[in-house]
Amino acid sequence: MRCGPLCRFLWLWPYLSCVEAVPIRKVQDDTKTLIKTIVARINDISHTQSVSSKQRVAGLDFIPGLQPVLSLSRMDQTLAIYQQILNSLHSRNVVQISNDLENLRDLLHLLASSKSCPLPRARGLETFESLGGVLEASLYSTEVVALNRLQAALQDMLRRLDLSPGC
């Protein structure tokens, strides 16, 4: 008789029964802290202060600006686009910010699942491959504009998280 899996399960049972779910308030606090950390990282990059997030730069319209109403799914979609843009820049300045965005998206998914509205994994820009020429021609401008707009979007997300956004 093969009882290996059953014996392993019974051996792990005391540990599994003691595991507590992470309180949603803790997830929300971690989300806010990570947003503040990303904003601080953007502030530490000195050249991001040279362009306003509202300023229009020709050819960079694919970088999202502020959204009127941000649901959790819209926040995730926006972060996916920024993450895709930052990954394409190949700049040492944005590697950690891009990693932080991935972690932030995971926290948003936890918040959404706590509200019984699991989010599908958002994709970035579908036409992104055609923008390669724009990115290569203006890496510095793209980085500055993307980081400024990301910072504004994150600060807006931080305010909206207090209002308990919908799915």
Curated annotation (Swiss-Prot):
Pfam families for this protein = Leptin (PF02024)
Task: Tell me which UniProt keywords the record has, alphabetically.
Answer: Disulfide bond, Obesity, Secreted, Signal
Any S-S bridges, and between which cysteines?
A: C117-C167
One CC-aspect GO term? extracellular space
Q: Which GO terms describe its molecular function?
A: hormone activity; peptide hormone receptor binding
Q: Would you kindly state one Gene Ontology biological process term found in this protein's UniProt entry?
A: lipid metabolic process
Q: Which domain of life is it from?
A: Eukaryota
Does Zinc-finger count among this protein's keywords?
no
Q: Which cell locations does it reside in?
A: Secreted
Q: Which SUPFAM superfamilies match?
A: 4-helical cytokines
The principal location of this protein is secreted
Keyword tRNA processing set for record: no
Q: Which family does it belong to?
A: Belongs to the leptin family.
Q: What PANTHER family does the database record attribute to this sequence? A: LEPTIN
**Record function comment:** Key player in the regulation of energy balance and body weight control. Once released into the circulation, has central and peripheral effects by binding LEPR, found in many tissues, which results in the activation of several major signaling pathways. In the hypothalamus, acts as an appetite-regulating factor that induces a decrease in food intake and an increase in energy consumption by inducing anorexinogenic factors and suppressing orexigenic neuropeptides, also regulates bone mass and secretion of hypothalamo-pituitary-adrenal hormones.
What is the protein's name according to its record? Answer: Leptin
